[in-house]
Amino acid sequence: MSLLSDLINLNLSESTEKIIAEYIWVGGSGMDLRSKARTLPGPVDDPAKLPKWNYDGSSTDQAPGDDSEVILYPQAIFKDPFRRGNNILVICDVYTPAGEPLPTNKRYDAAKIFSHPDVVAEVPWYGIEQEYTLLQKDVNWPLGWPLGGYPGPQGPYYCGVGADKAYGRDIVDAHYKACVYAGINISGINGEVMPGQWEFQVGPSVGISAGDEVWAARYILERITELAGAVVSFDPKPIPGDWNGAGAHSNYSTKSMREEGGYEVIKKAIEKLGLRHKEHIAAYGKGNERRLTGRHETADINTFSWGVANRGSSVRVGRDTEKQGKGYFEDRRPASNMDPYVVTSMIAETTILWKP
């Protein structure tokens, strides 16, 4: 085993200029991450200098068997925390050979919104709170829970410490450090209300980079749980009953919101979000109706609400923002399995571009 470990950790730069690039994309379900690697002649730090690539789309539910080629367009580069050295992770989006974006390519439309001059001028910042649940591999049951049974009720687990409260911290901490190494703007982690559930935060990130960084962080988490023999679930309500669901609270501000008088801009933006509540809910993740019940720190899915420091509302404004008269707000509706490209661009579109 030590020889295998030695080989995995070989430093390629000692013998060659060549690097390994892991191309990553979103598969046909919209949540399944896929990747494959290729050798490149030397270090690359600009995605525009990376070659396009292709894969068998019929095996990812993205193309028919008789016309199966799908093209990968490199869009963002991160350092590879697994191979290290000059090796890289490459976030890609997917196109037909004719250059048309696939239906599962949510980045394409998001990039159009984020490149709109009105959006560019507002420099939208995002902070995404990605919740997830760690599961025991073969039984589809949360890490640390007794098989066929339940732990004690919620209360001691949120930000909890100790072997009877925190399950999977080694995975969480490994993921945290790997994301920092990769160059992802990860800003923190914490244990969540339901035992076996955790959260990491990405941001503040500007525009399209928020989506790139969340997908890269999800990929790294999938790889680490693979090594640990656990499974990560982004289901918004993995365990029915009196247990918290999993969300992806999305914190947001624009230049106008961050400047003097920004609180009035925030209130107008929230009003617009309320007018498009149904459209946002439809785009905020599958199965979200199981989570947004009005209980467990959620608002009811059918009703839009907002409030200061209210975690039972659709949108929450922080006390500091109210006090300072400027800042940001938190959209609490997105589910843990949301597509960050969809959510971030839709918030920008509604609050900046959409005219009621």
UniProtKB/Swiss-Prot annotation:
Q: Give the InterPro entries listed for this entry.
A: Gln_synt_N (IPR008147), Gln_synt_N_sf (IPR036651), Gln_synth/guanido_kin_cat_dom (IPR014746), Gln_synth_cat_dom (IPR008146), Gln_synth_gly_rich_site (IPR027303), Gln_synth_N_conserv_site (IPR027302), Glutamine_Synthetase (IPR050292)
Q: Positions of the region Disordered?
A: 37-66
Q: Could you tell me which residue ranges the GS catalytic domain spans? A: 106-356
Q: What is its main location?
A: cytoplasm
The organs and tissues expressing this protein are described as:
Roots.
**Oligomer and partners:** Homooctamer.
The protein's name: Glutamine synthetase PR-2
Q: What is the organism lineage in this UniProt record?
A: Eukaryota, Viridiplantae, Streptophyta, Embryophyta, Tracheophyta
